[in-house]
Amino acid sequence: MAPGKKVAPAPFGAKSTKSNKTRNPLTHSTPKNFGIGQAVQPKRNLSRYVKWPEYVRVQRQKKILSIRLKVPPTIAQFQYTLDRNTAAETFKLFNKYRPETAAEKKERLTKEAAAVAEGKSKQDASPKPYAVKYGLNHVVALIENKKAKLVLIANDVDPIELVVFLPALCKKMGVPYAIVKGKARLGTLVNQKTSAVAALTEVRAEDEAALAKLVSTIDANFADKYDEVKKHWGGGILGNKAQAKMDKRAKNSDSA
């Protein structure tokens, strides 16, 4: 090398292997070996190995099947439910018209009997009762006669064939309808465990405005979109592994 010339520095600075951290000479590092029969294994999520009860397995498989398989539009429409705020307002109105319990009915009949004994009419003792109508056959008859003012349909009825025709029937008869989450929630409206449908036929004068407002909001989400919704199939979504496989295949075909 010619005198006065320096060697060029390395392009990547050599990392110093020395650590400035002072170690306690009394302690020794004991790296763990997680092989079979060695150190205790770290905590992992092992829920996929749990043998779940049959009803849990069935509902999981049903959910996954509904995502994977192609679902016809008539059934796929039940995944589009009423939004939370509108549903809260709707249930608030329906709660005012819950059917009377056995105790309330007994009290009403006692009052009517006392009024009749005094020479009065039944209507004087107790005004006309307004109540939510339920029962599939009963509600279907009300829709066919155009007596229902608002119909709520549960989205998780099993088998779905029981209610799959109701949106089309409501649309044909011009009856406002909404698909809501939970047959159990509908059941609480009518003092039952579950209910597939619930309908209002009459409301008091003070609730007419609230009902009209709800109907206009609900129609915008369901009846007005009916023709559009019945064109769209549901499901057909692959799992993560299948999607990764398809992406890899597409990438290979593009590069070829």
From Swiss-Prot:
It is found in: Cytoplasm. Gene3D superfamilies: 3.30.1330.30. Its main location: cytoplasm. InterPro entries: eL8/uL1-like, Ribosomal_eL30-like_sf, Ribosomal_eL8-like_CS, Ribosomal_eL8/eL30/eS12/Gad45, Ribosomal_eL8/Nhp2, Ribosomal_eL8_euk. Transmembrane segments: none annotated. GO terms for molecular function: RNA binding; structural constituent of ribosome. Keywords: Cytoplasm, Ribonucleoprotein, Ribosomal protein. Residues 1-37 are annotated as: Disordered. Residues 16-32 have a biased composition (Polar residues). One of its GO terms (biological process) is cytoplasmic translation. It comes from the Eukaryota. GO terms for cellular component: cytosol; cytosolic large ribosomal subunit. The keyword Ribosomal protein applies. Component of the large ribosomal subunit (LSU). Mature yeast ribosomes consist of a small (40S) and a large (60S) subunit. The 40S small subunit contains 1 molecule of ribosomal RNA (18S rRNA) and 33 different proteins (encoded by 57 genes). The large 60S subunit contains 3 rRNA molecules (25S, 5.8S and 5S rRNA) and 46 different proteins (encoded by 81 genes). Component of the ribosome, a large ribonucleoprotein complex responsible for the synthesis of proteins in the cell. The small ribosomal subunit (SSU) binds messenger RNAs (mRNAs) and translates the encoded message by selecting cognate aminoacyl-transfer RNA (tRNA) molecules. The large subunit (LSU) contains the ribosomal catalytic site termed the peptidyl transferase center (PTC), which catalyzes the formation of peptide bonds, thereby polymerizing the amino acids delivered by tRNAs into a polypeptide chain. Present with 238000 molecules/cell in log phase SD medium. There are 2 genes for eL8 in yeast. Belongs to the eukaryotic ribosomal protein eL8 family. This is Large ribosomal subunit protein eL8A. The lineage of its organism: Eukaryota, Fungi, Dikarya, Ascomycota, Saccharomycotina. The gene is RPL8A.
